[in-house]
């Protein structure tokens, strides 16, 4: 397994679950950040949201976004991929319902035509696990691996 493949495996181990990130978008060169629940699948993060939300409106005018939490950071392109019941969303919908099961239907109304999914296709990122850091360029399928320990004291 090469370093890029190892990095992808680590990404899956870390984020193929309900994981909260701060999502940064921007409009008219003014940044906006909010926490969102995400799910990682196949070099993409998915977010369940609403088409009229500020984040979705900003993504539609500028697809460049960042995700960050606990020194994990990613840059990518975000797209509104439409309503959950669209045929092309069938596979990811079943995964999102499963991973977000405790709250998916309680907080979302699939009868609302404005419910949607945002897909974040990753350009680059930094993450770590078990003393190893990874700096990854997803477009070129290149990754660096190095010793890394999260030694920051978190303050609530």
Regions picked out by a protein language model, each given a short descriptive name:
Residues 1-21, 145-148:
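Extreme N-terminal tail/first-helix region
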Residues 13-28, 64-68:
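A short, Trp-centered hydrophobic/proline-enriched beta-strand micro-motif
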Residues 18, 31-34, 62, 112-115:
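Short beta-strand-initiation
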Residues 31, 45-46, 125:
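Hydrophobic residues embedded in beta-strands of well-ordered beta-sheets
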Residues 37-39, 119:
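Well-ordered beta-strand positions
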Residues 39-73:
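A short mixed-secondary-structure module that forms the rim of ligand-binding clefts
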Residues 73, 77-156:
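Charged, gly/pro-rich active-site loop segments
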């Amino acid at each position: 397994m090469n370093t890029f493949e190892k990095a992808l495996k680590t990404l899956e181990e870390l984020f193929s679950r309900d994981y909260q990130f701060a999502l940064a978008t921007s409009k008219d060169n003014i940044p906006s950040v909010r926490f969102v629940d995400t799910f990682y699948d196949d070099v993409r993060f998915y977010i369940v949201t609403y088409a009229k939300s500020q984040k979705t409106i900003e993504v539609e005018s500028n697809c460049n976004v960042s995700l960050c939490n606990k020194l994990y950071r990613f840059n990518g392109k975000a797209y509104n991929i439409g309503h959950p019941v669209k045929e092309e969303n069938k596979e990811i919908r079943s995964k999102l319902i499963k991973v977000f099961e405790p709250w998916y239907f309680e907080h979302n109304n699939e009868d609302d035509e404005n419910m949607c999914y945002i897909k974040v296709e990753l350009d680059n990122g930094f993450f770590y696990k078990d003393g190893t850091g990874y700096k990854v360029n997803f477009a070129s399928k290149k990754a660096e691996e190095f010793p890394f320990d999260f030694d920051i004291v978190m303050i609530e």
